[in-house]
């Protein structure tokens, strides 16, 4: 028995040493991040496998279109080691949750995507240019990212208008910054983004509305296994993803606790209600699409930047404390 206890104690000491080494390694990389212009740091730069530095020197729409079309620039959700180190500092407990990890990687999601809204914006803002492009490219069936890129390069009316839209430019420039990323359970990213379903609902305000509904219904124990499951089922259409999401959310005492832990304070009002990205944006039929693009772009970038500030502040405090 004494020998067994000795072995257990030694294993615990070894684990503590491993955790200490991991923490020190995490601190070094995160400290270097904080020494940069961390509020504007583009995490796709951490996933740039091109042979020169031209991608990192890009900005605005040019960089966004390059990210979407270059094979050698990867998705930060699944490729940024820096983002992973930040997650480990802010949420160290997630490393022990099997429903949050895969092959040693904490699952991540880009909260508010650009492309779906940008494509709709092109259709609404440049109908003549879209029509002309489709006539000249009969094999093109819908407004894709490559079509947006080509139109930006070919039509001066498009490029000058986009470049003059300050809120849209700011939204695009903050797309890959810290405040637009969140750890999520296994399967969350693919299910929410619309593979086999619909990217029309791939908006973080809509996602938070359903998550809040889940927490609201969780208070009513007689409804718990029925209606609250349905709220998550609306977000996802795979049983495993639903179960993982419920495990994730059930790890928090309340909606307010969840909001605080994930730095979503700027996405809710003083009463804890989710603030839509634009007036009328909701899960109701016909209301899931953006009605006012200017309002959407302004609110989206403001919330991303505000959350980045909160996360950066929390990182500094955690590093100082440890």
Predicted regions span which residues?
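C-terminal, well-folded lobe of enzymatic/effector domains
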Residues: 193, 198-322
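Intrinsically disordered, low-complexity regions enriched in small/polar residues
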Residues: 51, 66, 89, 123-124, ...
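Intrinsically disordered, low-complexity N-proximal targeting/linker segments that flank membranes
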Residues: 1-166
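Phenylalanine-focused residue identity feature
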Residues: 33, 41-43, 61, 65, ...
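C-terminal substrate/ligand-recognition segments
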Residues: 80, 104-115, 119, 123-127, ...
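Feature representing long, continuous alpha-helical segments
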Residues: 120, 146-149, 153, 160, ...
């Amino acid at each position: 028995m004494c020998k067994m206890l000795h072995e257990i104690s030694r294993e615990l000491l070894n684990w503590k040493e491993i955790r200490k080494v991991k923490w020190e390694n995490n601190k070094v990389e995160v400290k270097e991040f904080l020494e940069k212009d961390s509020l504007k740091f583009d995490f796709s730069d951490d996933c740039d496998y091109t042979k020169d530095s031209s991608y990192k020197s890009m900005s605005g729409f040019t960089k966004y279109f390059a990210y979407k079309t270059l094979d050698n620039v990867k998705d930060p959700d699944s490729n940024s080691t820096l983002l992973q180190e930040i997650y480990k500092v802010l949420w160290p407990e997630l490393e022990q949750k099997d429903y949050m990890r895969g092959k040693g990687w904490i699952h991540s999601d880009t909260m508010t995507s650009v492309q779906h809204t940008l494509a709709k914006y092109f259709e609404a803002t440049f109908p003549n240019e879209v029509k002309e492009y489709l006539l000249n490219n009969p094999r093109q069936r819908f407004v894709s990212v490559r079509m947006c890129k080509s139109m930006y390069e070919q039509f001066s009316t498009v490029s000058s208008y986009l470049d003059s839209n300050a809120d849209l430019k700011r939204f695009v420039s903050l797309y890959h910054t810290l405040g637009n990323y969140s750890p999520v359970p296994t399967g969350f990213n693919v299910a929410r983004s619309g593979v086999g379903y619909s990217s029309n609902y791939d908006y973080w305000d809509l996602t938070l509305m359903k998550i809040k509904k889940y927490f609201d219904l969780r208070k009513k124990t007689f409804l718990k296994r029925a209606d609250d499951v349905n709220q998550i089922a609306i977000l996802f259409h795979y049983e495993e993803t639903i179960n993982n999401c419920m495990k994730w959310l059930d790890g928090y005492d309340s909606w307010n606790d969840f909001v605080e832990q994930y730095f979503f304070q700027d996405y809710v009002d003083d009463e804890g209600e989710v603030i839509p990205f634009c007036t009328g944006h909701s899960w109701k039929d016909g209301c899931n699409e953006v009605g006012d693009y200017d309002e959407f772009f302004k609110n989206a970038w403001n919330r991303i930047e505000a959350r980045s500030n909160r996360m950066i502040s929390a990182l500094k405090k955690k590093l100082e404390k440890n």
